[in-house]
């Protein structure tokens, strides 16, 4: 765990804040669809299950990668800035000093986390991997690229994208057990 996300995950807070500003109490088709996704997420209640993390991407469908990155960055700056654990920042710095290549895997939407995580930890944005959605004509679609970095998918992301055997890994939820 790189930073304290309490009482909510940043991904959820960002989506709910965005929905409050852009979709809540509106009657158009898109607003109803987006609110239905959030209702389904709340009803599911398993915020580390694959359907839940897939629905985060479904909610972001129609936004550009830049809009999603800005949404994540702004939420981080507003609610989570200063909550990166100094011990984790020191560990990452020490690993890099000794020649380790550091990667961050998250079950949150990749574009939502890349900018602020890379900025705060000083790692390349390409080393922050999350749930990937297909970008078509410059906007996120609701199609998801496998593997999903959750449950057994997190272990599959390593050979698929990193292509190296890790020397050390860490996790913060039951979705990281595999």
Predicted stretch roles:
Residues 63-103, 107-178:
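C-terminal cap/substrate-recognition subdomain and adjoining C-terminal extension
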Residues 8-82, 86:
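A metal-dependent, Asp-based hydrolase signature
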Residues 1-8:
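Asp-based phosphoryl-transfer active-site loop
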């Amino acid at each position: 765990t790189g930073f304290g996300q309490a009482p909510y995950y940043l991904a959820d807070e960002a989506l709910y804040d965005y929905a409050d500003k852009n979709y809540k109490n509106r009657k158009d088709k898109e607003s109803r669809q987006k609110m239905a996704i959030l209702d389904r997420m709340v009803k599911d209640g398993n915020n580390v299950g694959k359907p839940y993390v897939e629905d985060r991407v479904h909610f972001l469908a129609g936004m550009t990668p830049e809009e999603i990155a800005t949404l994540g960055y702004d939420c981080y700056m507003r609610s989570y800035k200063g909550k990166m654990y100094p011990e984790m920042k020191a560990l990452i710095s020490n690993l890099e000093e000794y020649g380790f290549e550091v990667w961050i895997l998250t079950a949150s939407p990749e574009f939502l986390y890349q900018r602020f995580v890379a900025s705060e930890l000083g790692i390349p944005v390409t080393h922050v991997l999350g749930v990937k959605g297909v970008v078509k004509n410059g906007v996120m679609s609701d199609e998801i690229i496998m593997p999903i970095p959750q449950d057994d998918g997190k272990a599959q992301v390593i050979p698929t994208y990193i292509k190296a055997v890790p020397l050390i890994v860490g996790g913060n939820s039951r979705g990281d057990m595999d």
